[in-house]
Design a protein with these regions (language model features):
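Conserved, well-ordered alpha-helix/loop/beta-strand core segments that scaffold catalytic motifs
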Residues: 99, 103-132
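Alpha-amylase-like alpha-glycosidases and glucanotransferases acting on alpha-linked glucans and related
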Residues: 1-107, 132-210
């Protein structure tokens, strides 16, 4: 069968927004608080997930600019100062909170699934790509770690030369890393990325790493 991803995304997004709207209802919040302290769990997740605010603002920005990639946004959000970022967080507060909420739902459900699998003696192998997408929160928040020009466009991109998979080679388009900058930080971004992924899986495979 053929999956119609557009329709699937539209359908699921509608359900997630409905779930968020219901959560904002005071009566529903009271019900959660008395049954399993859902609100406290959510607040703890938000406080302990240092990556969450940047991700939520990035996604809210994507919505605000109608899906445009970050390098085509207004300069105040394309490459914001700390003050400008705070202003956008306030301006898009409702959308930011929505993206925080659905990330919480995902992590909560994934944690339950992983625990169930582990209890049954099943280990989960995660797949972490060695490169990240140009239009991603990783690049938007860490421009100096990637080989970009002053406008945010990649100077060099990932790919492979001709091999037994493709006679003409492949151009993936992912921006390459600026390794000199990673060295200066002690590869902090990499360590954070791997540590985080190891919370989601028991083992990791670095994809396309040879």
């Amino acid at each position: 069968c053929k999956i119609e991803y557009g329709k699937a995304i539209e359908f699921k997004t509608g359900l997630l927004k409905k779930a968020y709207e219901r959560y904002q209802d005071p009566d529903v919040q009271d019900a959660y608080s008395t049954s399993e302290d859902f609100a406290t769990e959510y607040n703890t997740f938000c406080k302990e997930s240092e990556w969450l605010d940047d991700y939520a603002l990035f996604m809210a920005g994507k919505d605000y600019f109608q899906g445009a990639p970050w390098y085509m946004w207004e300069d105040s959000l394309k490459k914001p100062t700390a003050k400008q970022k705070a202003e956008w967080m306030s301006k898009l507060a409702v959308e930011v909170e929505y993206y925080r909420f659905i990330q919480f739902l995902f992590y909560r459900q994934w944690e339950a699934l992983k625990q169930y699998a582990n209890d049954k003696g099943i280990k989960i192998v995660g797949d972490i790509p060695i490169f990240v997408a140009w239009d991603s929160v990783d690049v938007w928040c860490n421009k100096k770690l990637f080989d970009l020009d002053s406008k945010g466009y990649p100077k060099t991109v990932a790919g492979v030369p001709p091999d037994y998979f493709s006679a003409t080679g492949q151009l993936w388009g992912n921006p390459l890393y600026k390794w000199s900058e990673h060295t200066k930080t002690g590869y902090e971004w990499w360590f954070k990325r791997i540590r985080h992924q190891l919370k989601l899986a028991d083992f990791l495979r670095i994809d396309h790493f040879r």
